UniProtKB/Swiss-Prot annotation:
Species classification: Bacteria, Pseudomonadati, Pseudomonadota, Gammaproteobacteria, Pseudomonadales
Bilayer-crossing regions: 43-63, 67-87, 104-124, 132-152, 179-199
The EC number(s) this enzyme carries: 7.2.1.1
Name of the protein in its database record: Na(+)-translocating NADH-quinone reductase subunit D
Function: NQR complex catalyzes the reduction of ubiquinone-1 to ubiquinol by two successive reactions, coupled with the transport of Na(+) ions from the cytoplasm to the periplasm. NqrA to NqrE are probably involved in the second step, the conversion of ubisemiquinone to ubiquinol.
Membrane topology per record: Multi-pass membrane protein
Location of the protein in the cell: Cell inner membrane
Subunit structure: Composed of six subunits; NqrA, NqrB, NqrC, NqrD, NqrE and NqrF.
Domain of life of the native organism: Bacteria
Family as reported in the entry's similarity comment: Belongs to the NqrDE/RnfAE family.
A GO cellular-component term linked to this record: plasma membrane
Amino acid sequence: MMAAQPTIREVLFNPVFQNNPIGLQILGICSALAVTSNLKTATVMAIALTLVTGFSNLFISMIRRQIPSSIRMIVQMVIIASLVIVVDQVLKAYAYSLSKQLSVFVGLIITNCIVMGRAEAFAMANPPLVSFFDGIGNGLGYSAMLLVLGFVRELFGAGKLYGISVLPTVNDGGWYQPNGLLLLPPSAFFLIGLIIWALRTWKKDQVEAPTYKMAPQVSSKEAY
């Protein structure tokens, strides 16, 4: 008996909270650390990855029955790389300064675990329309995490949002002393940890079963 096909609503909204690519699957961490020092770069990266994931899923699903199993990963990489090149060229043409800030991380979307994972695990086994929305949904889940990180890091690290002053800083005669630590990549790692803790506190079903049990404490005499 074939399993029921997931609905568009499920694949679009489940990755945001229920099965978040970063929060639950722990994928796409590297770019999340690097591009979230401000909301502008976080937003552009989020849009870029969402579009690439959605359209790569769509195109791969459309030709999934014609792809030989032995070269399916190569075909997936070619499609994803082509889409990433288009995104990169558009950024260089219309938002060159942002393209410079994002540096190599747009190009590294090609090897992003979220994009590759959805292409292999979902698009190769499902129809084009639902595959497209699965890609968009996972992109939205990734985007939500990036925007939260970018919001916290830019607001409390520089007192700004999208480059606009929100908290008047001491250097400008205001009251807020920016926390420069939040602008460093390691701070994003700790923030991601806090978000994961909050998600798993809220949704108990996301808590993983322990892989081992601590041995009971024994006295030194019993140990020997």
